[in-house]
Amino acid sequence: MANYFNTLNLRQQLDQLGKCRFMGRDEFADEASYLKGKKVVIVGCGAQGLNQGLNMRDSGLDIAYALRAEAIAEKRASWRKATENGFTVGTYEDLIPQADLIVNLTPDKQHSAVVQAVQPLMKQGAALGYSHGFNIVEVGEQIRKDITVVMVAPKCPGTEVREEYKRGFGVPTLIAVHPENDPKGEGMAIAKAWAAATGGHRAGVLQSSFVAEVKSDLMGEQTILCGMLQAGSLLGFDKLVSEGTDPAYAEKLIQFGWETITEALKQGGITLMMDRLSNPAKLRAYALSEQLKGIMAPLFQKHMDDIISGEFSGGMMADWANDDVKLLTWREETGKTAFENAPQFDGKIAEQEYFDNGVLMVAMVKAGVELAFETMVSSGIIEESAYYESLHELPLIANTIARKRLYEMNVVISDTAEYGNYLFANAAVPLLKGAFMASLQPGDLGKAVAGTEVDNAQLRDVNEAIRNHPIETVGHTLRGYMKDMKRIAVAG
């Protein structure tokens, strides 16, 4: 199999990278009706598999779970989750032949084996669904020509997909039809019905492509969503402790600071996040973010280039074939860091204190979000896609760190995201550890910025620069569809 993206000519590559249209709510008037009366079989019962299935069943669809025979015989976690929630569970041979739509929600590294196992069992004219297009785009999986291939990609972890649905809402979602596999022209109808069944149509749906989803998703998770948070956590904690800060306080400021800071980002973009700072602190955070962007732009561009070319996916798949040696080594190294093993702080940190004492963290968020967005857009990805894969998902990932530090983040995200996270963080930490971290001033981290003097013209110009960044323009529009988003509880 060959990387699908690399088989396309330049015009086709640009066309698929740039495929992105915000769909009107009227396009979902029929909601999930296209799939009602059809048999939907989900392969895999992890976070996405279980929670999408629960939503789809509550939307009136006929849902069952196909698991490997050994998972059923040994009553593994996937079998327990499906059966405890009252779903029909069977082997591939039991359920796949009758299915109208098979939804593959297993981890990326299992996709080829799963597809090769289920494809011979699929009836003529059935549909195959994904929530991430890595197997199609990067692996280049060949699907039978009578099979329709679609994607519905919620832009949240599976637990959030369920919680938002239970609130009567949903999470923003990308949908796509593989252009090589739409023999009956029904792919979009299937994808729309599936998205509606998960509740995604209530939060906004982007009609995208497999290519655009994969390339933007990989870029976001490697850089700002995971890699920047991991690098910032390790660098920030070590800096605080080296300057005499109580390790327990330093750990809490970092662990819960990302969540608190990005909650403002979620509600009002970079503008609101920066407005939570005093005027002197805002000017300092802006200056630090511009400095960070200058230092890190080549690293962001390298990650984007390696994603576009297939260099990243090739390296990761080689590690799959080598029993995940790199991934497991990096995971172990992260677990041994001082931040991961610091004592817990018993005291309370007020919400505003996270901003006042976390100016560097605010600067890192601003720099990372803008760089990821700018790099994706300059590579042909449309602004709406770039927004969802950078700013939108950041509070959700920060929330995982608040639960159990970096360990929890790396458990919750996919192995693909975790591998990319380590690649980025392992390069970003030494890049910033020397001159940049040494140049920090009192008030950048751990203490509030001293002084109250502000130049009016400078503040005016900085405010205009923040508010006029393209991600703020597109974000204002897209957040309008998400006014019912629940607030993530911030720690004290």
Swiss-Prot record:
Cofactor binding: number and manner: Binds 2 magnesium ions per subunit.
Binding locations of NADP(+): C45, G46, A47, Q48, R68, R76, S78, D108, K109, Q110, G158
InterPro entries cross-referenced by the UniProt entry: 6-PGluconate_DH-like_C_sf, 6PGD_dom2, KARI, KARI_C, KARI_N, NAD(P)-bd_dom_sf
PROSITE patterns, sorted: KARI_C (PS51851), KARI_N (PS51850)
The reaction(s) this protein catalyses: (2R)-2,3-dihydroxy-3-methylbutanoate + NADP(+) = (2S)-2-acetolactate + NADPH + H(+); (2R,3R)-2,3-dihydroxy-3-methylpentanoate + NADP(+) = (S)-2-ethyl-2-hydroxy-3-oxobutanoate + NADPH + H(+)
Signal peptide boundaries: none
Residues reported to bind Mg(2+) 2: D217, E389, E393
Residues annotated as domain KARI N-terminal Rossmann: 14-208
Pfam families recorded: KARI_C, KARI_N
Function comment: Involved in the biosynthesis of branched-chain amino acids (BCAA). Catalyzes an alkyl-migration followed by a ketol-acid reduction of (S)-2-acetolactate (S2AL) to yield (R)-2,3-dihydroxy-isovalerate. In the isomerase reaction, S2AL is rearranged via a Mg-dependent methyl migration to produce 3-hydroxy-3-methyl-2-ketobutyrate (HMKB). In the reductase reaction, this 2-ketoacid undergoes a metal-dependent reduction by NADPH to yield (R)-2,3-dihydroxy-isovalerate.
Name of the protein: Ketol-acid reductoisomerase (NADP(+))
Species this chain originates from: Pectobacterium atrosepticum (strain SCRI 1043 / ATCC BAA-672)
